[in-house]
Every structure is written in structure tokens, then in C-alpha cells.
Amino acid sequence: MIVSFIDLSNNFSVAVIDNFYSVFELGEIQNELKLLNVVAELKIFVNTEPAKDEQGNLKQKSNSFFLDNLYTNKRNLSKILNINRKLFNNEELRTKLIEKNLFYNHIFNANFDKTLLNFYAKDDYYKPHKDATCFTALTFFSLEEFCGGNLIFPEHNVEIVAKENRVVIFPGFVLHGSEEVTKGIRVSMAQFINYYTET
């Protein structure tokens, strides 16, 4: 695991973690993604909350759905939903993030998260938007060798290459998007991290 940071301002940064999952974990995730790609193509489950522009047009062109909805009350059946807990219980990562900025401690104190899978085929994209999250953690996977689909932060002129097993963590209020995929299938796993209070 290699952790680096890109400063967007004096107050916050983007964390980039390469080789986050082990070879074994990555294999388990890839196997499940191959099955879930069919679910995405059949649109059995779909993301009903993608970002829209002021005219109500979708900013997203890709197949996506919340994994939590597919495995409702059966999370133990999903390798992905179990393996991605690593984000919250990896002490080495926690130490490095908090050493950079105490604000990252929200990741480990938050009590609610959801996992969205985005399957980007050729010509798919996600125009710049903001998330209603405290933090968003994006992890990139490859179902087929892909080109394009880099993560962009247009207000800060930052572009991060989308590569297998790379995690990018950033505050949800930062404008971000995915460039068009020009070849293959690129998958992103978005973990939306928040606080939840029952009313």
C-alpha cells in the first residue's frame, strides 16, 4: 500500500492509495464484479439518484447500482461488501490519513456508508458533480483493459489516472467527474461515507 496526497487547498487534500487490496482480495472482488456486470447490463438494479444538471438531464452515462440494495439483509453473501470494510479498519491507512489532516478522522467515526458500483464501457462518463457525503472513496477496477476514465477535479485543475486497485478519497463537496472511457470496461466502487441520525 502506497499513500500519497494531492493538496487542493490549504485546508483539504485528496488521498491516493495504490495497491490497497491484496492480490487475494483483488481476485475475490474481480470474480464478483464479473457476475455483477451482468446485473448492471440487465438493469435489474439501477441507481435512482445520479447527479443531474439544472435542466434535469443526467450527468452520468454508465450502468450503476447500489450494492447494498442488491444484498439487502444478506451482506455476508457479498465478498465486496465484506472486503471493502478494510477502508475503515486498516490502522496503517488511518494513521497516515490523520497525520496529514485530522479531518480524515471523520472516515473512521462515521456510522453510515453505502457502496455504489459504476460500470463504464466505451463512451461512458460522469460529468462534474458533487456528492452529498462527508467523504467519498473511489476504487478503480478493470474488467477489461481500459483507456480513459480518469478522475478529474476541474475547479483545481487536477486529474488522477484511473488504475487498477487505486483508491482516491476526497470530501464529497469537491466538484469531481469521470472522463469518457475510450476502450474496455472500467469499474469504480464508490463508498459514500456519512453520519446517520435517526429522527
Can you describe what each PLM-predicted range is?
Residues 90-199:
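Catalytic core of non-heme Fe(II) oxygenases with the double-stranded beta-helix
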